[in-house]
Amino acid sequence: MSDAALSSRPAASDTPDAPALPLGTSDEGGLVSGAAPSEAPPPGELVEPGRALALADFAPPSINAGERLIRLAYRLGIPGSTLAAPLRKAAKPRLLATVGNPLPGSKMAGTALRAGHFLVHGVKSPIAQIDFAGAARMAPPLERVVHSFSWLADLEACAPREAVASVAERIMGAWLSANPKPPSRPGKGPAWMVGNAGARELNWLVHAPLILSGSDRVLRAKVLTALGETARWLDKNVGRAEDLLAEVAGWCGIVAAGLLLPDGKPRRLFGEAGLIRALGELVGDDGGVLSRSPLGQIEAIALLVRLRACYQAVRRDPPLALEAIMGLLVPPLLALTHGDGSLGSWQGSWAMDAQELAALVEASGVRTRPLRDVRQWGYQRVVAQKGILQFDAAPPPLAKHARTGCASTLAFEFSHAGQRLVVNCGGAACAGGLIPIRLEQGLRATAAHSTLVLDDANSTAVLIGGKIGSGVSEVDLDRRTLIGEKNAGATRIEASHNGYVSRFGLTHRRILILRDDGTELRGEDLLVPAGRKGKTGKVGFAIRFHLGPGVEVGLSEDGQGAGLALGDGSYWQFRIGGEGQLAIEESLWADGQGRPQPIQQLVIQGLVSRGGGSFAWLLKKMG
């Protein structure tokens, strides 16, 4: 076993100002050890979302001295068959149990597969034209679907097994012919990235009846051989994963193989310790993944849900630490849902449908409330009756954690009664579907989010490959409750970032005040000189408010406001404080399937002195 598989990485104001917008009356090295695992709440029990992580949450399961020796020997490269049964021949390849699929796929995508196409984010790609060897690179979303075999869940969802098994076997045979042997290490094409290989091993095991129930004995033997070879490849290469989430996927594949393939106990012990360590590095103190991406949060939950199904198939309880971590992952994700249960558009995600999210949360077995203040993950959530405000109050993720990192600091989304009024464009992660790949970097830019932009520059540099460069490094945050009479109280959030200081000498500060009845959102965007000697001259600014789908907008006669008509028949008014010009521009929004939808945006724009400026605005429900 390679050194990489044995290596470990290190873990990853006193007196607030008065409101600027006052409201009127209107064991071994490399494995986490040293603490007993904490008890996880039983499935279905309401979890308190504010509970902080304890060291015990990331402790490997308690094992005896003999099992510790087995785990150490396996890490050193002694075959599992030798450790599990040293006095007999290695067992023949077979599966020890059948796994029940805990997460149904897309019937529409499965139907497309039966018709001969992969359907990914609205684009049909003929199976016959897919290069399974990976010499000709595909769009990233299609590449992930093809090589992770996540499409098996879609196929299983669309028809009885006997009706779709032949399709699965045909694609499986083509993939195995193009990938007969694993390479020595990752990097030999997308099929052998650790994230794809780990997810593929897990999906093969969860959906094994689709690819092993046919009459073709030669294919069956090839599939069983591929299961074993992929597991051994992951044993050696999981430490070379492209990022932490990919490493977690690799460890999940290892543990699943240890549970369901013969002589797997040494691999399972090795994999459980590695998985819990990797999760400890992936997840922050409040349960949010360090990429700050809700899609990353969803992927981590889905991996653990499928892995738990493998434990259930062999009638073995998963480690308590895995259940505890599952309970920590769900509340931050729910903080980014709107009133209709669908997802906000953050860090490259699209507005995932409520039904899909609800199915994931139900499968997790975690009953909990959304976190209100996910401060370390970087998001604030305010619920005011039917109004929901989501606010990005943190720097973008570090480059090593980002997959589709976005320069979205101080952006917000706002919905009322399930109707989205203000959104972010989203969709960078699904670029390559109906959203052209050339728009990927633009959808990650500051201008694609509902916040202030200076001189058309990003508050944090947006780099290729989903990475993030220099820019915002500090965000100050203050949140408080304002007491008022007759439901006139409010929640006030004030935050500032330094992303424009080095270029323009200005700090962006944003104040948002949402009334407790959810019908009025006041805002103020301030540009404050960062030093005693401010720079001279003026710089262009634009404060963008991307409007939700179905919102009809028209400017007022004085040019200082706009009327917003929503699909539910309600009417809202937007007003500005006199500084800047208000305009309507075209925009784009990624819907629940990752498809582009045309929307509009309100833009306050003009020139501001390097000495600073203040721009107030109001969004109010009129009827």
Can you describe what each PLM-predicted range is?
Residues S2-I127:
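Extreme N-terminal leader/anchor segments
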Residues S2-P10, L21-G24, P140, G198, ...:
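CBM-like, beta-strand-rich accessory domains located in the C-terminal region of large
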Residues G110-T111, D373-R375, G405-A407, A445, ...:
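Short solvent-exposed loop/turn micro-motifs enriched in small/polar/acidic residues
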Residues A115, W377-R381, A411, H449, ...:
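Short, acidic/polar N-cap/turn motifs at the starts of alpha helices
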Residues F118-E143, E156-P160:
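Asp/Glu-centered strand-loop micro-motifs enriched in Gly/Pro and often flanked by an aromatic residue
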Residues P140-M326, F574:
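Aromatic-lined, polymer-binding surfaces characteristic
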Residues A249, A407-T409, A447:
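Short, solvent-exposed loop/turn segments at the edges of secondary structure
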Residues G284-G427, S609:
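Carbohydrate-active enzyme catalytic cores, enriched for enzymes
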